[in-house]
């Protein structure tokens, strides 16, 4: 079991993107930082907002890239390479079109599924895709042509409340994730109902 050393929350920078569906991963990391009572601060060296906390004697680093989504890998690779963090010790939280709002799932490895942030992370990590993902459901607009405006839009209140609940569920299983007990975390998280 590999303990998680880096948790990344994907999103786009700037106030115009705050609270958009595409920033679900960044919202997760913001909530995690708050729960751990640490402040995310800008760090130009890693092209993002960073923080650190300790869990069972191990450092866990938080990162929200401040590059745009399609350049997220630049930020992740800079921090991971500097601290010699292997892909299997990274958890990337991101929005997921293929899951309904209120559903969160953990996954290890796999492709990018059309997600530009994941695509760039895989490329910047030398085509290694063996990192863990926290997939936060945002739903799908029903037509591929509508996806861009959908993910860059704000969710209606009922949808946002479901996303918030899925983030709470994910935060609840985080101790198991941090310890590397993904089987237990997945059982608990995947049994939650939206």
Curated annotation (Swiss-Prot):
Transmembrane segments: none annotated. One of its GO terms (biological process) is rescue of stalled ribosome. The active site is at 22 (proton acceptor). It is found in: Cytoplasm. The record marks 12 as: Discriminates between blocked and unblocked aminoacyl-tRNA. It is an enzyme of class 3 (hydrolase). Monomer. This is Peptidyl-tRNA hydrolase. It comes from Pseudomonas putida (strain ATCC 47054 / DSM 6125 / CFBP 8728 / NCIMB 11950 / KT2440).
């Amino acid at each position: 079991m590999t303990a998680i050393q880096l948790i990344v929350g994907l999103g786009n920078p700037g106030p115009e993107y705050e609270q958009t569906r595409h920033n679900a991963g960044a919202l997760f990391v913001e909530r995690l930082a708050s729960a751990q009572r640490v402040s995310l601060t800008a760090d130009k060296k890693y092209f993002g907002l960073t923080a650190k906390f300790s869990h069972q004697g191990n450092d866990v680093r938080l990162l929200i890239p401040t590059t745009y989504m399609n350049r997220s890998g630049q930020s992740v690779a800079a921090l991971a390479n500097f601290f010699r963090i292997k892909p299997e010790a990274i958890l990337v939280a991101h929005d997921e079109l293929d899951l309904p709002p209120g559903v969160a799932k953990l996954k290890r490895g796999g492709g990018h599924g059309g997600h530009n942030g994941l695509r760039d992370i895989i490329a910047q990590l030398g085509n290694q895709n063996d990192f863990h993902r926290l997939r936060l459901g945002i739903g799908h607009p029903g037509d591929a042509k509508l996806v861009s405006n959908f993910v860059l839009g704000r969710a209606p209140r009922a949808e946002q409340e479901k996303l918030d609940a899925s983030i709470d569920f994910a935060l609840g299983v985080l101790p198991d994730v941090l310890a590397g007990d993904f089987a237990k975390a997945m059982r608990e998280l995947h049994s939650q109902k939206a």
